């Protein structure tokens, strides 16, 4: 970083009747006015280069919203104002991180919970899902067969384990739109909670 970059910030030069923008930099605490004679006055006003962090977050979010027609419409709807306020408070990075975490959690927890429940039910070996799910059933069955492997053969019924796991996997796949909705809705709330430990740590460091 050069000395010029360190001690100067953006300024606005007012000459005569019209302003002239100069890309100089200077500490935001200082404001200088300079008058010269003859030929009128020259006024130099230094503009702060530090934007409010909240303002920066809102600007980033607006750019993201503007890329989606749906988000733009929802943002303009007063019914969803509370949600978008939460989104602005949480920030972009925590919200996106929260979305991915929730997306995975809403897949893993239902999968293993359904798997356990279905295994403990008396599912027949001839159990079949509707015909239009045959393709999905086959791919999920192959994935479950690889996952189970030989590790559970001694203590559990392998065929029943694979069948119940396959049905659970198919169910979770079908719930994909619901999972997406939950992840989008919960992201700003979870994101704000995710920030708490870092905010506390920052507060302790400042002390």
Curated annotation (Swiss-Prot):
Residues 1-46 form a transit peptide. Residues 120-177 are mitochondrial intermembrane. It comes from the Eukaryota. Component of MIOREX complexes, large expressome-like assemblies of ribosomes with factors involved in all the steps of post-transcriptional gene expression. The lineage of its organism: Eukaryota, Fungi, Dikarya, Ascomycota, Saccharomycotina. This is MIOREX complex component 11. Residues 47-98, 199-207 are mitochondrial matrix. PANTHER family: MIOREX COMPLEX COMPONENT 11 (PTHR28002:SF1). The chain crosses the membrane at residues 99-119, 178-198. It is found in: Mitochondrion; Mitochondrion inner membrane. InterPro entries: Mrx11. Associates with the mitochondrial ribosome. Keywords: Membrane, Mitochondrion, Mitochondrion inner membrane, Transit peptide, Transmembrane, Transmembrane helix. It holds the Pfam family FLILHELTA. It is a multi-pass membrane protein. Belongs to the MRX11 family. GO terms for cellular component: mitochondrial outer membrane; mitochondrion.
